[in-house]
Amino acid sequence: MTVVPIRIVGDPVLHTATTPVTVAADGSLPADLAQLIATMYDTMDAANGVGLAANQIGCSLRLFVYDCAADRAMTARRRGVVINPVLETSEIPETMPDPDTDDEGCLSVPGESFPTGRAKWARVTGLDADGSPVSIEGTGLFARMLQHETGHLDGFLYLDRLIGRYARNAKRAVKSHGWGVPGLSWLPGEDPDPFGH
């Protein structure tokens, strides 16, 4: 099992769009990609996350892993990887997010969560670990995860989507933790679980 540090908000790799994974003419993926995917699963699992984008561990490639239920109250989970994802969503509400149902956290903003407006439905298409086409979709928490992880790969954190008092509270939290600068990370399994799982 290989668990690596997760970068914290302020690291340039989190704020830069990732590079698509190169697919050979025969459809094969780079040989070292399988090890990266295994490391991402190990790190996500150690952090008790529902998703992890490659740039969260310092790799600027366009892929994410996930292990997520459709709803916060459900125990049945879906697990997988999407390489070179393309996101499609229903309309994103223009109202203030609900603090009870729209709360969102991030392993790169450890221990904090803020209500974030997201589309109720999302679909991602891309490739699986074998290079075969894959399409996954969902509603609720699963749709939120798809939007969150794809956002990472586009160089955005969920903090960038916050509005009103939630945006102000997030800025204060980042400042109070001393984040927002390059070089900060935490190591799941070694550092305390910031979300108290």
UniProtKB/Swiss-Prot annotation:
Positions with a binding annotation for Fe cation: C106, H148, H152
Molecular function as annotated in GO: metal ion binding; peptide deformylase activity
Methyltransferase in keyword set: no
Q: Which domain of life is it from?
A: Bacteria
Q: Does the keyword Hydrolase apply?
A: yes
Alphabetical list of SUPFAM superfamilies matching this protein: Peptide deformylase
InterPro entries in alphabetical order = Peptide_deformylase (IPR023635), Peptide_deformylase_sf (IPR036821)
Q: Name one GO biological process term.
A: co-translational protein modification
- Keywords for this entry? Hydrolase, Iron, Metal-binding, Protein biosynthesis
Q: How is the cofactor bound?
A: Binds 1 Fe(2+) ion.
Enzyme Commission number(s): 3.5.1.88
Signal peptide coordinates: none
Report the function annotation for this chain: Removes the formyl group from the N-terminal Met of newly synthesized proteins. Requires at least a dipeptide for an efficient rate of reaction. N-terminal L-methionine is a prerequisite for activity but the enzyme has broad specificity at other positions.
User: Sorted alphabetically, which PANTHER family does this protein's record hold?
Assistant: PEPTIDE DEFORMYLASE, PEPTIDE DEFORMYLASE, MITOCHONDRIAL
Name the protein family. Answer: Belongs to the polypeptide deformylase family.
Q: What is the protein's name according to its record?
A: Peptide deformylase
Species of provenance: Mycobacterium bovis (strain ATCC BAA-935 / AF2122/97)
